[in-house]
Amino acid sequence: MLNLSKSSQVKTEANAQEAVHCKLPAGIHRWLHTLLSSLPFKLRINFWNQDSYVFGAEIRETLPQLSLHIGHPGVLRSLILSQDPLVLIDGYLHGLINIEGNLEALIPLIQTHPHIVIKPLQSLQLWVEAYTLPQLPFNLKAMPLKDGQQIHSRDRDKAAIQHHYDLGNLFYQQWLDPLIVYSCAHFEHPEMSLEAAQAAKLDLICRKLKLSPGETLLDIGCGWGALLRWAVQHYGVRGYGITLSQEQLVYNQQQIAQEQLANRLTVELLDYRDLPQQPTFDKIVSVGMVEHVGIKNYPTYFQAALQALKPGGLFLNHGISSSDICNGSSVGERFINRFIFPNGELAQLSTMLSVAEQTGWEIVDVDAWRPHYALTLRHWAENFEQAFDQVASMLGERKARLWHLYLIGCALAFENDYERVYQTLLRSKTDKTWNLPLSRMGWLS
């Protein structure tokens, strides 16, 4: 809830009275009609209870698939003057926009209109009309999160991880599988359950790494520890995990005590840049962590793993990549970075593998999992919807709806090949003797 001073409250009340009698300017209406006429669905927008228009689909007899209620003209003013669609998200979180209908319909809207485009001949009229609309008593222009720290510094990375993962273990338990695996599952067939597909993923990783009893396994960014516990209990290894999430650390410590694994498994709060700089582990794995590293830090990341790996060992790196070059400027990227997942950064697989090779790794195997992540995300979105009342009680209803939209949007991104995910198996170039199976089937047996 907004905390306004007395003077701000007076201004808000006067502003609200002004908004009651404000009509939607004709030039803004024409611009919206042009912008939204090609929508593949019907969109009804109510402007602060003064005007209501339908945009999009031509069949007027059917009901709109989506309805937006903009509660104050200052939202539209801020949108046009800033030319930033994320203003709408800020307006929603402030309670100035209400949505009725299928949230998934918003995804093609964002994809169709990634930027607010105003033609030169329209710009002056729109600017004047927007400027004359009543102003909000606070700034609604969406700005990136800033903390005065260099991006991907140790402190900023830790803050970003805790922003995303420390929403509470109970929050993630509401919609993930029972093991709390927050990464792509592996489906042997489309009807496979999420729980079974996550267990299949954990076992497949262990087999790819050729884990043997007595070996030491490092998990960089171990999450809630499911993979480590699986490897310890099913393959007899000694596990060591690192995370920057305080909530994940607490959960891991509880599970280690409960399952009496203290002599075989350790999890610590540690940055990957502080890993041992000498050969320490027989095998290393990293699942869904490289997205947090940042492209400029790829050399440091791959070097840290290489230094910590014993001769003859393997490193399995599992991470999301982009199908095209990303620079963080798209609406989708900025939405995720601002509201859900700060400081995430994706690169094309070729970029990641080039850095790995330059760092001293030999690429052994590359496995594409894109359809598996689309299925995983659909399961998460469905689970989230079923547990919506519970998660809304933790996050608040509006933030919970943004999370649901995030999961649906990510599912569509993988389904439409905007994003991809790969498991890459690496070994040190200094290991001249081939000590691995001659074919992929050798890992899967």
Language-model regions, residue ranges each:
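A short glycine-rich, Lys/Arg-flanked "PGG" loop and its adjoining helix->strand segment in the class I
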Residues: 299-311
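Conserved class I S-adenosyl-L-methionine
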Residues: 213-221
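Feature captures hydrophobic
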Residues: 1-192, 196-198, 204, 233
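Conserved SAM-binding strand-loop segment of SAM-dependent methyltransferases
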Residues: 260-272
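Conserved SAM-binding loop of SAM-dependent methyltransferases across substrates and taxa
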Residues: 224-235
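Substrate-binding/catalytic lobe of Class I Rossmann-like enzymes that use SAM or dcSAM, i.e.
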Residues: 320-434, 440-444
